[in-house]
């Protein structure tokens, strides 16, 4: 059996209090450096927020001053950590979706004063006035309901319900055996047109 090599340990300091004090100072120096980096990053974020908020005035963000550091005393090993500054809130960007329309797009999210009345069910509404636009859009996009809703909202400014789009896709589908859908119902039988 080969003799094991002994690990060389650094010689312990002669005075333990000096050793503990030097360790506490190193920890405090590292914490102060971390705090300075955090404050610099917060200052950069604050300047970015000020640049973004040139369009609309917003209340300024006040950062609390750093708390005084506590030092370790005696031969206690416990060091107290400084309270961290609260994380900065993420900057909200305006809503820039291509399919948002209207004057409220990207503005405050407070509902208009009549929104409480509009929350109730409104009953039947005829979509017949938009029939040609719905059918043309569904045929052009291959029957994709989600795309048709976004497209019609963007180009016509009307949010069509999904069930209406499903109805027109089924009724006027070019893939039905009943033909192109003109004058036919969902069962594929042609209706007799009344003259008179």
Swiss-Prot record:
Residues passing through the membrane, by range: none
Keyword Cell inner membrane: no
Signal sequence coordinates: none
Key word Transmembrane helix present: no
Cellular-component GO terms for this entry: host cell nucleus
Region (Disordered): 1-125
The entry's keywords: Activator, Host nucleus, Host-virus interaction, Late protein, Repressor, Transcription, Transcription regulation, Viral genome packaging, Viral release from host cell
The organism's place on the tree of life at top rank: Viruses
Compositionally biased intervals (Acidic residues): 14-54
Induction: Expressed at the late phase of the viral replicative cycle. Probably already expressed from the early to late transition.
Biased composition (Low complexity): 55-64, 71-82
GO BP term, pick one: viral DNA genome packaging
Subcellular location: Host nucleus
Misc remark: All late proteins expressed from the major late promoter are produced by alternative splicing and alternative polyadenylation of the same gene giving rise to non-overlapping ORFs. Expression of packaging protein 2 and splicing factor is controlled by a L4 promoter distinct from the major late promoter.
Function: Component of the packaging machinery which encapsidates the viral DNA into preformed capsids and transcriptional activator of the viral major late promoter (MLP). Binds, along with packaging proteins 1 and 3, to the specific packaging sequence on the left end of viral genomic DNA and plays an active role in packaging of the viral genome into preformed capsids. Specifically binds to the 5'-TTTG-3' nucleotides of the repeats making up the packaging sequence. Forms a transcription factor called DEF-A through cooperative binding with packaging protein 1.
Protein family per UniProt: Belongs to the adenoviridae splicing factor family.
Subunit structure: Part of a genome packaging complex composed of packaging proteins 1, 2 and 3; this complex specifically binds to the packaging sequence on the left end of viral genomic DNA and performs packaging of the viral genome. Self-assembles into higher-order structures.
Name this polypeptide is given: Packaging protein 2
Organism: Human adenovirus C serotype 5
Lineage: Viruses, Varidnaviria, Bamfordvirae, Preplasmiviricota, Tectiliviricetes
């Amino acid at each position: 059996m080969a003799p094991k090599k002994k690990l060389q340990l650094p010689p312990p300091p002669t005075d333990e209090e000096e050793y503990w004090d030097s360790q506490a100072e190193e920890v405090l120096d590292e914490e102060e450096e971390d705090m300075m980096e955090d404050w610099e990053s917060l200052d950069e974020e604050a300047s970015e927020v000020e640049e973004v908020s040139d369009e609309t005035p917003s209340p300024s963000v006040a950062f609390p001053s750093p708390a005084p550091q506590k030092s370790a005393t005696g031969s206690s090993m416990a060091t107290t950590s400084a309270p961290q500054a609260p994380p900065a809130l993420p900057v909200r960007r305006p809503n820039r979706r291509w399919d948002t329309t209207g004057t409220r797009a990207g503005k405050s999210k407070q509902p208009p004063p009549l929104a409480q009345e509009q929350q109730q069910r409104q009953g039947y509404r005829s979509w017949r006035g938009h029939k040609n636009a719905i059918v043309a859009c569904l045929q052009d996009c291959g029957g994709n309901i989600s795309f048709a809703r976004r497209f019609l909202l963007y180009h016509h400014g009307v949010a069509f319900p999904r069930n209406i789009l499903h109805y027109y896709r089924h009724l006027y589908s070019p893939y039905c055996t009943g033909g192109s859908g003109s004058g036919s119902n969902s069962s594929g039988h042609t209706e007799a047109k009344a003259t008179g």
